[in-house]
Amino acid sequence: MALLRSKLHLSRTLSFISPLLPKTFSTSATSLLSDHENDESAATITAAVSVPISPLLTPEDTQTVEKFHSIIKDHYRKNPTSPNDAILNPSLTLHALSLDFSQIETSQVSPSVVRCVIEKCGSVRHGIPLHQSLAFFNWATSRDDYDHKSPHPYNEMIDLSGKVRQFDLAWHLIDLMKSRNVEISIETFTILIRRYVRAGLASEAVHCFNRMEDYGCVPDKIAFSIVISNLSRKRRASEAQSFFDSLKDRFEPDVIVYTNLVRGWCRAGEISEAEKVFKEMKLAGIEPNVYTYSIVIDALCRCGQISRAHDVFADMLDSGCAPNAITFNNLMRVHVKAGRTEKVLQVYNQMKKLGCEPDTITYNFLIEAHCRDENLENAVKVLNTMIKKKCEVNASTFNTIFRYIEKKRDVNGAHRMYSKMMEAKCEPNTVTYNILMRMFVGSKSTDMVLKMKKEMDDKEVEPNVNTYRLLVTMFCGMGHWNNAYKLFKEMVEEKCLTPSLSLYEMVLAQLRRAGQLKKHEELVEKMIQKGLVARPL
């Protein structure tokens, strides 16, 4: 959320025709930076700047943030609750927590400290300590010496509430801002709009926009663009189009708005509708930019219309619009996925001829193409080129190679590549650790599996369902019911992850064999309480 705030602030200070603004769409290849887990076209007005501006914290404040966060985490570990267990009391206080907070020696709890603590609480994917975060927020903002001028802690808490779909709580916080005369800005509503859209509540997002003036916040062109951007990103193209049509006379559309509409229709798979907007854009005298063309090319490639994509690419060149790395990556992807390495290299060579510098995603595609061809030597050559050119390497760069090494069951090769990853100062992600642990489980290297899990914990890399399935299955296979049970409970209670039925039954079987009938009953009851299994008849 801090990133969103810095982006929005800078969006306001930049002209809509600034040459810097096309960076708005620079995240269009996000998926390839995260193991293809997300859709690639993530271009939005809110992505104007890619580097967050961190609050200015003193070393003392940073330590204070860590202390508060540690107390919250410890309390959550002992009292795990799902954010959706019940409707929260907005005035929630937790007496034991308040006492612990009060023990921390600090002259004043600043808004920056409060904001950072809440941001850290909400930064995890699973096991968000919402109750504890709200209790901390209420404790901090009720202190006599608290400075209520800053809206940022409120905005952060609104973002966290929206993330776990506690929208009534989010509106309560906005009302609280109003009653305390805290500034309510477009940023506040942008946060809530984004969360509504992510929750699939498009009409509520539009309603949120319409309520801005009730709180003394006048909607402007940026807010208009942000709504369209968020709806488009989540494939709510028809809602984005309706919203656009209803307000385009009030807020003059620009290349960013039209490009987001084009993207929305493309993501929804409605290429003909995207083409209509594309033509309307030109008729309105607004020239498509490199991101507009790249989005259309991407959509055509994804639906198999590769020749049409190349036609659009030719039109792009004829219009004098220079392609960038995103354009070529979009042309390259379809060939990578189809295993057409020769075509991938043709696109890459064309890219070099036109003087377009490859980026991380380009090189990641080349590595993937070579690994699909089982040509590890060429894949490593590309990796070495990246390092030599100081092109950023990321976890996905190495994960593709690790997958190939796993396929070949080359444990020594995995060790060598991991050392290379550390030398490149590239941080492993959850996928990296899962691949390596799976390989070490296969080679019966239990010590290495445990070493990887400890490293994950030390580096605060979040485990996912696959991580726990791998570890629990390993311990069950070894007959270590206690470790399997402990990890399964951690998965369900602390991380709020949903295990497969087969994994659940595997742990129950271990408990029965070990004669741990009480733990067996407790686990069954916990799973029933969480609605993960039905109560036996």
From Swiss-Prot:
Q: Where in the cell is it found?
A: Mitochondrion
Keywords carried by this UniProt record:
Mitochondrion, Repeat, Transit peptide
- Which PROSITE patterns does this entry report, sorted A to Z? PPR
Top-rank taxon of the source lineage equals Eukaryota
Q: Which Pfam families match?
A: PPR, PPR_1, PPR_2
Q: Repeat PPR: residue ranges?
A: 150-184, 185-219, 220-250, 254-288, 289-323, 324-358, 359-393, 394-428, 429-463, 464-498, 500-534
Q: Which SUPFAM superfamilies match?
A: TPR-like (SSF48452)
Q: GO cellular component terms?
A: mitochondrion
Targeting presequence: 1-32
Give the family, as the similarity comment puts it: Belongs to the PPR family. P subfamily.
PANTHER family, A to Z: PENTATRICOPEPTIDE REPEAT-CONTAINING PROTEIN GUN1, CHLOROPLASTIC (PTHR47936:SF1), PPR_LONG DOMAIN-CONTAINING PROTEIN (PTHR47936)
The protein's name in its UniProt record: Pentatricopeptide repeat-containing protein At1g20300, mitochondrial
Species lineage: Eukaryota, Viridiplantae, Streptophyta, Embryophyta, Tracheophyta
